[in-house]
């Protein structure tokens, strides 16, 4: 049974999962405490995580979404995004996501309803 639930304390216990999306712990630290974290588990086994931050009034950003490699391409990431969009729909008019240029990630987000907006220089450095 799939369950998605928020994590309020000890978010760093999922550092191995978070580092699948962002290898630099210092970057994770920048958003982890101010963000809301969700874990997706299936049959009591953690499969995926995401962290959402409020960037401005009504503007939120998916800072991190990660699925353990052995569980990828099984719909867990898509379910987590669908949950997040539903969870924030009443307080969010814009949901952002920043990602690399991987040939898999942009089409994935587009298939989840996101529209490509622009390419930012040094996005992962600033």
Segments predicted by a language model, with ranges:
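Conserved N-terminal entry element of GNAT/NAT acetyltransferase domains
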Residues: 1-10
